[in-house]
């Protein structure tokens, strides 16, 4: 495999995520003592502890020095600066984030987390990214659309909406679902022939494709609509209000567009014009 920018980030994140989970991560903030019993932060500290999973470039990953970085972290920093609080980031496994949030180990989650009515006891911010799901396959694959997944093995990251879609395919007798720990592992599994396709967030796939179009490709139309939000505990409406206010200001003052450009992401017009909120309301109404 070619040693290029994004694969270096992916492999670095894959090797280091276990270490990060154990020691608090490359970012000094990850080892903050603010994560106290019953509440990750206190009113007097003015610090919000944010859980993330740095295996998801360009939204959260590790740089060449092992520090956590990415669009979500920069966005959270911008929101915090606008609203007058500080943030500290804590690395953990993706499927442990909601549990950590509801037990007070962290105050918020910024980890490319999709709006999902099955996520209980939490509140989502307004959407900040249109991240529809797509199908990634090997560059020489003859899979051209979802219709071609019959009898195939389809991978996805455990705990994600992609995993829900893969599981639904298996339950329908269409394909075999293979749920793996993170997207890096899914990509490696695809490249080594362990699966035939990945259901993956399109912006993440596009970031990988920039340097690896000779290895993989996105195929067919977007598989399903998906949006990201920042997540807080259901009892923390005050923090949610600050996050939403800060997000609106960051979008309005142009900082949001700057961050999209920095991480080579398409500016999500549905977020800027408000139509993403309507789409999310429809998604979340499925729980009612």
Residue ranges and their predicted role:
Residues 54, 130-137, 202, 206, ...:
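Periplasmic-binding protein-like
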Residues 25, 164-180, 217-219, 248-288:
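Ligand-binding clefts/hinges and TM-proximal coupling segments of bilobed small-molecule sensing domains
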Residues 6, 19-39:
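Bacterial lipoprotein signal-peptidase II cleavage site
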Residues 34-112:
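Extracytoplasmic small-molecule ligand-binding "clamshell" domains
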Residues 73, 88-100, 141, 177-192, ...:
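Short helix-initiation/N-cap motifs at beta->coil->alpha
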Residues 81, 86-148, 217:
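Acidic, polar ligand-binding/catalytic clefts
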Residues 24-26, 73-82, 153, 160, ...:
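Extended ligand-binding regions for polar small-molecule ligands
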Residues 112-121, 167-168, 191-192, 196-225:
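A ligand-binding cleft/hinge motif common to bilobed small-molecule-binding domains
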